[in-house]
């Protein structure tokens, strides 16, 4: 009766492995990787990213009051150096270097300085770490790993970089996009790791985006904020937020495009759209690969008075354990969804709410939309439940990709979030992570 | 490897069945019950409570914007009648009468009027409903059930009343307390139903407390607010909030105590303490009986700057799926607890946080407390992890009752919440509730 997780949609994220072009990676960036033994499996656990030209950098960090040493160090390095002049980043998996006190901070600095020194970079490296918290990194392993990784630097192996930052991820996560701007074609590549503890506000995830665009620090910051809002802050797996989350973007200007300094320019908007597409695809890969997830769920809110309120309602639905358990059971339990809408904190009118369940991404579903009866069913019309065929509903929800579409009837704003179901496998995976 | 739920602590709540005295029930109240067929099992699904003397009533209702018909009706009846003059309450299980539109409201009124009419009560009955939402009640069954229940009215069978309001509860929930006040001994009895969707702010739970105390409407309201804060609003199962939640207290004055009109009087404080004890025991029974729970978990926060901030931190821990999964796995994962402290929204200083895991209720655990090494282990000292024996930790957490104690080092306020672990059984139970 209960599905084996191994039969589920875990193959999907791997398709990205066949879909990237090595000749479209941003120019001037190299990656190097190594397996230094932090991971008991012997898999790669050190990743270095190096740019021949100095980069402008923007970053968003965890809002958790408990911040890991590499987060504290990287924030400080960025501020001290005015978000520019960076040539390198070092990432380790297999240890979060969080709750590690003064020694932890010292170790993060050692990683930073060793990397920049080996790369002959004029400025200290940024640092990211992921893994178990509360344990000191074995620095003899890490130092050897960094030295080994530097010897492997090359321009085309971004997939190994994506692999080296994995923890409980089942597949490496990489997305790329190119866009023609004034003065040249610009390339973007992003890698990330996710799995458990994913939440709006970016729980336990690391993401690095590199682009050869020429863009000012201020514009880069605005672009990243926008992209993170619509990607990593629009996904939910289990509502926890980690000590290490970081999204950083490096821009080295090697594309030779006309330097972007204006957030209202066409070049800026095109680049922003492209980066948003890269981060959105990465964020969706994280949801698809979430520990124990069996379904990819799109939550679409229409008719909100403001986009922010739409986001609050979408978040309330996507964090409801009862909604997520029902989806796992392929039960179109609109009552639980409506309850989550009702307690979201937004002042909704229950008698204006309409609701649909759909297969796929719910794109053409809702008030005044196509609402193909083969792929969607309406369950609620202005607060009143509609008669429905339970067998057809269960069949709809038997798909791997399903959507819940809610019309609030309050205004014209929309919001979309992505989440997954809550499965027995989630509990199994998370009850024995450390051992 | 994974425990069978049937072997777990489900017996515990039943112990209350042996622990009540029929001669200590509040005077002047009778209960009647019937099985009218709303429950497919044929179990009792109608409960009537009747007081020979008119009662002052206070009530707290769900804050969900989507409110069930009986909630809307009862609120209106209370306001219209200034919270006094009520002789009766009718409750059905097997159907929540929520999202049922005008017809639902009409049905709730029919239940109210039929009950007061059969009881010859001068004022319409209050109404509560629980069960699946979005379906109209079968009123021919309900009306017959109310008529049948009226014929069974008696003073001693509060356990049948507790049984008749159960939905997915495994055991009936009843608590009682007596206290000597000026002018006479006062008795209190409370019944409630809980199970899934339990949250601070009282999700899917109904509770009725009856007392023969003589107390003003205003004092009764103050007393209930206090009691709910420290009981039903201090438990968490899965963070959802339902459309039907109601806690009501009826006071009929039959004890002959000196009428209480002053919230600073000794009589008021004693009665408040007694009611708080009753509601706290009921709230804890709800957690122990939560769908799929295998552990009863006490979260104690000490050293908060304000009680409210302590409550926010406790709530953040008790809603973390990762913390709750780890507890199920008997894994002393202090890192997940610390992460939940860090993202609670309270401005904590990670370098001041201490943390203990304990068996039992964590009462004697914390800074400057006994901290018996047989029953507690400290994992974090001012932000720094302590070396620990993982086997001993797992043994500690193998108990059914466990506690997490956190010292924030910010001030002198404390807060306690009760929750349960997140188990595979929870997901199973909630993925197929409707079918």
UniProtKB/Swiss-Prot annotation, chains A, B:
Its main location: mitochondrion. The record marks 203-204 as: Cleavage. The alpha and beta chains are autoproteolytically processed from a single precursor protein within the mitochondrion. Substrate binds at residues 167, 193, 204, 291, 430, 435. It is found in: Mitochondrion matrix. InterPro entries: Arg_biosynth_ArgJ, ArgJ-like_dom_sf, ArgJ_beta_C. It catalyses: N(2)-acetyl-L-ornithine + L-glutamate = N-acetyl-L-glutamate + L-ornithine; L-glutamate + acetyl-CoA = N-acetyl-L-glutamate + CoA + H(+). Pathway: Amino-acid biosynthesis; L-arginine biosynthesis; L-ornithine and N-acetyl-L-glutamate from L-glutamate and N(2)-acetyl-L-ornithine (cyclic): step 1/1; Amino-acid biosynthesis; L-arginine biosynthesis; N(2)-acetyl-L-ornithine from L-glutamate: step 1/4. The active site is at residue 204. The record marks 130-131 as: Involved in the stabilization of negative charge on the oxyanion by the formation of the oxyanion hole. Its EC number is 2.3.1.35, 2.3.1.1. Keywords: Acyltransferase, Amino-acid biosynthesis, Arginine biosynthesis, Autocatalytic cleavage, Mitochondrion, Multifunctional enzyme, Transferase. SUPFAM superfamilies: DmpA/ArgJ-like (SSF56266). One of its GO terms (molecular function) is L-glutamate N-acetyltransferase activity. Belongs to the ArgJ family. Catalyzes two activities which are involved in the cyclic version of arginine biosynthesis: the synthesis of acetylglutamate from glutamate and acetyl-CoA, and of ornithine by transacetylation between acetylornithine and glutamate. NCBIfam families: ArgJ (TIGR00120), PRK05388.1 (NF003802). HAMAP family: ArgJ (MF_01106). This protein may be expected to contain an N-terminal transit peptide but none has been predicted. Heterodimer of an alpha and a beta chain. This is Arginine biosynthesis bifunctional protein ArgJ, mitochondrial. It comes from Heterostelium pallidum (strain ATCC 26659 / Pp 5 / PN500).
């Amino acid at each position: 009766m209960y599905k084996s997780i191994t039969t589920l949609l875990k193959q999907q994220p791997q398709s990205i492995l066949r879909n990237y072009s090595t000749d479209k990676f941003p120019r001037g960036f190299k990656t190097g990787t190594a397996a230094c033994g932090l991971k008991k499996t012997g898999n790669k656990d050190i990743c270095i990213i190096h740019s021949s030209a100095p980069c402008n950098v923007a970053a968003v960090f965890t809002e958790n009051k408990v911040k890991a040493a590499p987060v504290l160090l990287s924030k400080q390095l960025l501020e001290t150096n005015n978000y520019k002049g960076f040539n390198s980043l070092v990432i380790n998996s297999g240890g979060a270097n969080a709750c590690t006190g003064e020694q932890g901070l010292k170790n993060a600095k050692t990683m930073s300085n060793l990397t920049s020194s080996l790369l002959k970079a004029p400025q200290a490296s940024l640092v990211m770490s992921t893994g178990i918290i509360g344990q000191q990194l074995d620095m003899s392993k890490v130092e050897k790993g960094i030295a080994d990784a530097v010897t492997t630097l090359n321009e085309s192996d971004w997939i190994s970089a994506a692999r080296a930052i994995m923890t409980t991820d089942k597949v490496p996560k990489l997305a790329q996009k190119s866009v023609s701007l004034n003065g040249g074609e610009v390339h973007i590549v992003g890698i990330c790791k996710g799995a458990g503890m994913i939440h709006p506000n970016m729980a336990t995830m690391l993401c690095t985006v590199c682009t050869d665009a020429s863009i000012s620090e201020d514009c880069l910051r605005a672009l990243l904020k926008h992209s993170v809002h619509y990607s990593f802050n629009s996904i939910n797996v289990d509502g926890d937020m980690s000590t290490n989350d970081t999204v950083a973007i490096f821009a080295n200007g090697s594309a030779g495009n006309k330097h972007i300094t204006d957030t209202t320019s066409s070049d800026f908007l095109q680049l922003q759209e492209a980066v948003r597409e890269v981060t959105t695809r990465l964020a969706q890969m994280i949801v698809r690969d979430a520990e124990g997830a069996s379904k990819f769920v799109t939550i679409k809110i229409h008719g909100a008075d403001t986009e922010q309120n739409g986001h609050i309602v979408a978040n309330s639905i996507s964090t409801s354990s009862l909604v997520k358990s029902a989806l796992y059971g392929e039960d179109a339990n609109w009552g639980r969804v409506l309850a989550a809408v009702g307690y979201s904190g937004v002042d909704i009118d229950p008698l204006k709410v309409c609701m649909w369940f759909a297969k796929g991404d719910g794109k053409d579903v809702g008030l005044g939309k196509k609402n193909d009866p083969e792929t969607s069913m309406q369950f609620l019309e202005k607060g009143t439940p509609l008669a429905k065929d339970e067998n057809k509903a269960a069949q709809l929800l038997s798909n791997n990709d399903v959507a819940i579409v809610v019309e609030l009837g309050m205004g014209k704003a929309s919001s979309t979030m992505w989440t997954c179901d809550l499965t027995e496998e989630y509990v199994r995976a998370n009850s024995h992570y450390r051992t």
